[in-house]
């Protein structure tokens, strides 16, 4: 049993289109290869950058924004001047704890992720606190392939 539905080394994006609420999955490579940058931002109600912590069914959609799912990204959010949203806006993992959620523009977030080749938390990271049930991290103390707290 793999508690982490996105366990490979690719950032997944979930696109919720207004027409049918269908979830379309993209990778950054796909976006780059097909030059879908503007097309994605134009057609998308919501774009989620999923940092491999697993989101289950507990998605709270807000049209026109990107949700960064990791409080460990606070440093990056601050560094690149992406404003955190009000503290009462939360996004919860199914079976996990609520995590602070940051909202930035769709275009800026896709550009940021593309430039930095961002890859998020792995469920199997040693030394990362988990909830003891699913094996998923609490608040994403480490990031991989991104400049992070522990320098990995």
Curated annotation (Swiss-Prot):
This is Orientotoxin-1. Its main location: secreted. Its EC number is 3.1.1.5. It catalyses: a 1-acyl-sn-glycero-3-phosphocholine + H2O = sn-glycerol 3-phosphocholine + a fatty acid + H(+). The keyword Secreted applies. GO terms for cellular component: extracellular region; host cell presynaptic membrane. Neurotoxin of presynaptic effect which degrades lysophospholipids. It is an enzyme of class 3 (hydrolase). The keyword Magnesium does not apply. One of its GO terms (molecular function) is lysophospholipase activity. It comes from the Eukaryota. Expressed by the venom gland. GO terms for biological process: lipid catabolic process. Disulfide bonds: none annotated. It is found in: Secreted. Keywords: Hydrolase, Lipid degradation, Lipid metabolism, Neurotoxin, Presynaptic neurotoxin, Secreted, Toxin.
């Amino acid at each position: 049993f793999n508690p982490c539905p996105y366990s490979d080394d690719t950032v997944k994006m979930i696109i919720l289109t207004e027409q049918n609420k269908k979830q379309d999955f993209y990778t950054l490579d796909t976006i780059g290869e097909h030059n879908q940058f503007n097309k994605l931002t134009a057609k998308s109600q919501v774009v989620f950058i999923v940092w491999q912590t697993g989101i289950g069914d507990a998605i709270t959609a807000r049209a026109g924004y990107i949700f960064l799912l990791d409080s460990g990204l606070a440093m990056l959010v601050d560094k690149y001047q992406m404003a955190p949203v009000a503290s009462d806006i939360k996004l919860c993992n199914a079976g996990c704890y609520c995590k602070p959620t940051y909202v930035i523009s769709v275009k800026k977030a896709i550009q940021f992720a593309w430039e930095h080749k961002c890859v998020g938390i792995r469920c199997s990271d040693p030394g990362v606190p988990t909830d003891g049930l699913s094996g998923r991290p609490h608040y994403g103390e480490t990031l991989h392939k991104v400049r992070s707290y522990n320098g990995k």
